C-alpha cells in the first residue's frame, strides 16, 4: 500500500478479532501491521495490565492515542484497542480517518473468548452482564466512525479477508 493512502484501521470491542484478522490480512498481502496494544507494550516495556495498575486507565488512553498518531502514517493495517473510542482525542482523530472497519461480535462469544483473561484489565473478573454494559456503552461510538462493519462471529476469517482485500484494492485506485 502506498503510505500516502489511509491505513485500514480496525476498531471494535475486545475479543472481536481485530488483532487476528489484521495480522492475517497483512501476512497474506505482505502489508505492514501494527497492533496498538502490542506497540504500547514494546515501547513502554510494560504490559497493558501493568500500565492500568500503575498509572490508571486515563494514562493508558493517552498513551494509546499518542501511539495511534505515531503509527497512522507508517502502517497499512492498524488494530486498535477496544476502548480507544473512550478517549475524546482519539475518537475525534479517528472520525477524520478513512477506512475505519468495525469488527463486531455476539457478546456471548466475546465473553467466552476473554473471560478472566489477565491481559485484559477492563474484562478481568467481570460478569457477562458487566461486560455487556461496557459493550453497549461503546456501540454508538463504534458505529459513528465506522466506514464498514463486519460481524466476526458470522463470517470466517477468509470471508472478512476478501472483503478487506476489496477495500484495499479500491483504496489503491484513488
UniProtKB/Swiss-Prot annotation:
Which Gene3D superfamilies is this protein grouped with? Answer: P-loop containing nucleotide triphosphate hydrolases (3.40.50.300)
- One biological process GO term for this chain? aromatic amino acid family biosynthetic process
- Summarize where Mg(2+) binds, as residue positions: 19
> A GO CC term?
cytosol
- Chief place where the protein resides: cytoplasm
UniProt key word Cytoplasm: yes
Needed cofactors, names only, are: Mg(2+)
Domain of life the protein comes from: Bacteria
Molecular-function annotations in GO: ATP binding; magnesium ion binding; shikimate kinase activity
- What EC number(s) does this enzyme carry? 2.7.1.71
Q: How does it assemble?
A: Monomer.
What is the name of this protein? Shikimate kinase
Amino acid at each position: 500500500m502506498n503510505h500516502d493512502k489511509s491505513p485500514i484501521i480496525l476498531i471494535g470491542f475486545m475479543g472481536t478479532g481485530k488483532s487476528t484478522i489484521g495480522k492475517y490480512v497483512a501476512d497474506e498481502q505482505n502489508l505492514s501491521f501494527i497492533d496498538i496494544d502490542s506497540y504500547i507494550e514494546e515501547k513502554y516495556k510494560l504490559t497493558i495490565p501493568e500500565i492500568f495498575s500503575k498509572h490508571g486507565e486515563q494514562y493508558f488512553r493517552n498513551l494509546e492515542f499518542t501511539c495511534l498518531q505515531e503509527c497512522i502514517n507508517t502502517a497499512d493495517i492498524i488494530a486498535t484497542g477496544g476502548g480507544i473510542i473512550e478517549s475524546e482525542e482519539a475518537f475525534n482523530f479517528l472520525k477524520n480517518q478513512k477506512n475505519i472497519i468495525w469488527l463486531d461480535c455476539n457478546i456471548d462469544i466475546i465473553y467466552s473468548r476473554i473471560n478472566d483473561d489477565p491481559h485484559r484489565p477492563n474484562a478481568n473478573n467481570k460478569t457477562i452482564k458487566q461486560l455487556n454494559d461496557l459493550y453497549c456503552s461503546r456501540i454508538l461510538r463504534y458505529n459513528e466512525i465506522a466506514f464498514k462493519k463486519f460481524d466476526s462471529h458470522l463470517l470466517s476469517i477468509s470471508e472478512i479477508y476478501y472483503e478487506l482485500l476489496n477495500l484495499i484494492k479500491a483504496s489503491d485506485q484513488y
